[in-house]
Structures are given as structure tokens and as C-alpha cells.
């Protein structure tokens, strides 16, 4: 299935059902009083994370989603049925952003996690609600309020512990094949990897971590060159980054300059991403003799002024990959528990406080004094609809 990590959709919550104006009609009860019921609340729209999904492609073909409207109230104090909520299933790691305000509604990072993105309209009130000692035959009702409408931008960011960085043909896909059962395409030309790949590494029994491979970066990637820049966001949630460096590039380029270009692109794209723990992994060591290899590695580390961890591997021959995997699992296990993603400012929905405000308004204007046998005159009042802003 095609990998799609962005989609724009429109969600519409259901309108609230309107209240009803009705009076009790029953034999031997000449003055039955009001019995109009309230309407039902409109259905809301939710996003729910499911780990069995890994793409947003479904939302490219179906962009409009609407929840059910609440039913109107009826006589005999019958309350309208509430509209059914609409639940949209998305992959774990999805972020929802309001297109108009650009505010983040939240991230779904756990299987089964649910998030409200459009709140259903509030139900209208029937004329029973307006009965008081001074208004025994109320002909007022309120209409249901409209449901919220939002344009949402959905962004999928893969959840992985380790992310791979490097120039095209540095050997990232070969490395992920050597340490996991993932089978990304490998070939001798640049940009063989076109979409991110995930692999699960099991260095020890009962211990594992997830590794992510993205398309290679080139100079100018932060400004739109190449493919990798659009996938850099998938590394934002990684705990550690592996900078894969080809020790002997086939095109004759300088590995040191390539490494510097990658670091520069990271800093341009996201200083937060550039500040993550980053290990230098020098690949394709099988192409050099041992003496020449040692000298070349020392020169690279010296020129880069690299102060972090440095590892030499041959992903093709699986030399050094197992030891590196063990180092990674030990490092990840030693890290403190991952902090929850920073919560954005609390999102306000249209009708969050409507219920409380409506009740306060009723209490101010009417006394709560009910009598089922209050007298009323059918011709005293006309039906009055109260519109709520």
C-alpha cells in the first residue's frame, strides 16, 4: 500500500436537535400543562489510533466526514435521540492540526487513544423547561446549536527508537536489513529508498527496539532539495540518531564534507532534532585494508572534531552490526522514561460552556415551580422560538 503521511480533511459534528412545544392531551385532564421534550445532542467527531494502520492514504480519497445530527424532541416529555459519534481510525503517531488557526489539537501516540476534534451541537430545550409559577403555559423553545466544523491537517510521524541519517547510498537500507527482518530495496544508485522503512531489532531475548530508515539527505535538503527533507519529521520522536557515513564513496566525494552537510541540514530543519544524541557509524569498512582503515577513521573523526560515539561496521558483511545493536539497546534501556509529548494549550470547543450558560439563563428568568395541572389558555400566547448565539 502506498505510504502517505499527510492529508487534509473536513470534519463536521452533528447539529443538536431542537426542543419541542407540546401540551399534555389526555381524557379527564383538561389542563395538562406543557410536555415538550428536549432535542438530542449532535454527534461528535473523534480520531482514534490503531497500530494496524500505517498510512493516511484512505483520507486522500474520502475528505469529508460528518457525524449524525441529534433528533428533535417530541411530546410526552420525549427527549430526542442523540446523534451517533463518528470515529475516524488513524495510524499511531498521527498529529491533528487545525488548518485555519494552525493550532495543534494533539498527538495520538498509543494504540486505542482517542481525541475529540469536533464537538457536536448542544440540544435545544422543550417548552417544559420554561414552565414556572408565572408562565404556566410556555410556548418557548430553543433550537439545537450547529455542530463544529473544522478543516484538519493530519500528519503521520513514525514512532521509532533509533533513526538513520546519511547521504544517498551510504548503506542505511543495507544496515536495517542486516539487523532486522525489514527488507527495504537495496541497489547501487542514489535514492533507492523512496519512503521511510521500519524494522524491529532483537539484540537479546526479550529486548527490542524499533529503527527507522528515511530517504537519503543531500545538501540543500532543508530548502527542498532531494527527498529526505519531507521525511525528517519521522525522526523527531527517535531517542538516538545513527549518522551512517560511507568511508569510500563510489562518486569520490569527501566523507567529511558529506557529514558536515548532513549536520548543517539538520540544524536548518530543526534545532531540536539536531540536538538529539547522535552516533557516528562509519560503514563499508570491508572496502579497505585494516591499516588504511584505521588511519582513515582517525582522520575523519579528527577533521569532524567528533566528540560522540564512533563505530565502524560493514553492513553488507554484518561485521560490527551485532555489537552496535547491543550498544544501542543498552543505551536506550538506560535512558529515563520518555517524557510525554508537550501538551498544547487546551483546545476550546464551541459549546464547551453552553450547557452551564443555558441553565444559568433559565434559573435567572424562571422559578423552578412546576404544577402538572396549571391552567392555560390556548390563545394567550403564540409559539416563541428562542435563538441562542
Curated annotation (Swiss-Prot):
<feature type="domain" description="Obg">
    <location>
        <begin position="1"/>
        <end position="159"/>
    </location>
</feature>
<keyword id="KW-0342">GTP-binding</keyword>
<comment type="function">
    <text>An essential GTPase which binds GTP, GDP and possibly (p)ppGpp with moderate affinity, with high nucleotide exchange rates and a fairly low GTP hydrolysis rate. Plays a role in control of the cell cycle, stress response, ribosome biogenesis and in those bacteria that undergo differentiation, in morphogenesis control.</text>
</comment>
<dbReference type="InterPro" id="IPR006169">
    <property type="entry name" value="GTP1_OBG_dom"/>
</dbReference>
<feature type="binding site">
    <location>
        <begin position="283"/>
        <end position="286"/>
    </location>
    <ligand>
        <name>GTP</name>
    </ligand>
</feature>
<dbReference type="Pfam" id="PF01926">
    <property type="entry name" value="MMR_HSR1"/>
</dbReference>
<dbReference type="InterPro" id="IPR027417">
    <property type="entry name" value="P-loop_NTPase"/>
</dbReference>
<comment type="similarity">
    <text>Belongs to the TRAFAC class OBG-HflX-like GTPase superfamily. OBG GTPase family.</text>
</comment>
<protein>
    <recommendedName>
        <fullName>GTPase Obg</fullName>
        <ecNumber>3.6.5.-</ecNumber>
    </recommendedName>
</protein>
<feature type="domain" description="OBG-type G">
    <location>
        <begin position="160"/>
        <end position="333"/>
    </location>
</feature>
<dbReference type="GO" id="GO:0005525">
    <property type="term" value="F:GTP binding"/>
</dbReference>
<feature type="binding site">
    <location>
        <position position="193"/>
    </location>
    <ligand>
        <name>Mg(2+)</name>
    </ligand>
</feature>
<keyword id="KW-0378">Hydrolase</keyword>
<dbReference type="Pfam" id="PF01018">
    <property type="entry name" value="GTP1_OBG"/>
</dbReference>
<keyword id="KW-0547">Nucleotide-binding</keyword>
<comment type="subunit">
    <text>Monomer.</text>
</comment>
<feature type="binding site">
    <location>
        <position position="173"/>
    </location>
    <ligand>
        <name>Mg(2+)</name>
    </ligand>
</feature>
<keyword id="KW-0963">Cytoplasm</keyword>
<keyword id="KW-0479">Metal-binding</keyword>
<dbReference type="GO" id="GO:0000287">
    <property type="term" value="F:magnesium ion binding"/>
</dbReference>
<feature type="binding site">
    <location>
        <begin position="191"/>
        <end position="195"/>
    </location>
    <ligand>
        <name>GTP</name>
    </ligand>
</feature>
<dbReference type="GO" id="GO:0042254">
    <property type="term" value="P:ribosome biogenesis"/>
</dbReference>
<dbReference type="InterPro" id="IPR031167">
    <property type="entry name" value="G_OBG"/>
</dbReference>
<dbReference type="InterPro" id="IPR006073">
    <property type="entry name" value="GTP-bd"/>
</dbReference>
<feature type="binding site">
    <location>
        <begin position="213"/>
        <end position="216"/>
    </location>
    <ligand>
        <name>GTP</name>
    </ligand>
</feature>
<dbReference type="InterPro" id="IPR014100">
    <property type="entry name" value="GTP-bd_Obg/CgtA"/>
</dbReference>
<feature type="region of interest" description="Disordered">
    <location>
        <begin position="122"/>
        <end position="144"/>
    </location>
</feature>
<dbReference type="InterPro" id="IPR045086">
    <property type="entry name" value="OBG_GTPase"/>
</dbReference>
<dbReference type="GO" id="GO:0005737">
    <property type="term" value="C:cytoplasm"/>
</dbReference>
<dbReference type="InterPro" id="IPR036726">
    <property type="entry name" value="GTP1_OBG_dom_sf"/>
</dbReference>
<dbReference type="GO" id="GO:0003924">
    <property type="term" value="F:GTPase activity"/>
</dbReference>
<feature type="binding site">
    <location>
        <begin position="314"/>
        <end position="316"/>
    </location>
    <ligand>
        <name>GTP</name>
    </ligand>
</feature>
<dbReference type="InterPro" id="IPR006074">
    <property type="entry name" value="GTP1-OBG_CS"/>
</dbReference>
<keyword id="KW-0460">Magnesium</keyword>
<feature type="binding site">
    <location>
        <begin position="166"/>
        <end position="173"/>
    </location>
    <ligand>
        <name>GTP</name>
    </ligand>
</feature>
